[in-house]
Amino acid sequence: MNATEAGLDDSITDFSRRRVDVDGVVKTVYVSGDGPGVVLMPEMPGISPDVLRLARWVRDAGFTVYVPSLFGADGAYPTAENGQEVVRRACVSAEFRAFAGGGTSPVTAWLRGLARQAHGECGGPGVGAIGLCFTGNFALTMTLEPSVIAPVVNHPSLPLDDPAGLELGDEDARAVRERVERDGITVLAYRFDNDRWCTGQRFAAYRKLLGDAFDGRVLPGGAARTDPPPFFRDVVQTPHSVTTAHLVDEDGHPTLKARDEIIAYLAARLHS
């Protein structure tokens, strides 16, 4: 039984806790593993036990995982009350663009710097980036950093008020499309078919922007875990987190297959 199944916080003792400076902005990053670098960004409401479980799976598959603290209490079990407060703070933060018309979240510039540092430390052909929920689209924006060659966009929820929108400014959208076309990057993405926060309209918008470079995979909502932590049960209220809170850790399960596909994608891009 892991921490989330027991309703406990995760102490994160198997990761080194670093203070990482990018252009004078310092954030906490949890690092563990050996091999090519993968930046795994948290979903709302923070670096939960489920996010850390995914990070450990990636680490154990032969990667160095970097988990930046962007919001919430690190390692905390996601309760409804605390999670709602984290969302409220993030929605008005200068680092994020949660609503339509806001363009690209400024924090992605810092994340690109983290990817550069990870590549410098780990070497290899490049770095992977996994975004989840609130940070889902950040993995795509990070391809503006040349070292990022394996973006995974999981259930991207921004902008919150436009189901067909993308959390990207026009100039960045053009630059991302050009980078993807120029370097032959495939963008891997996942959602549940009945997710209200990441709809088919959003995946259609990605397809319009990226064409065949967008590999959007859709799982049946009925495959989602039925007893997720309180934040997901009471606030999210829909199948959403394919590889974290709504993952079912059983052999052959569609969500576990999605996890395996992500790891295989990272291995194909980063271990070559």
Residue ranges and their predicted role:
Residues 1-272:
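N-terminal cap/leader regions of alpha/beta-hydrolase-fold enzymes
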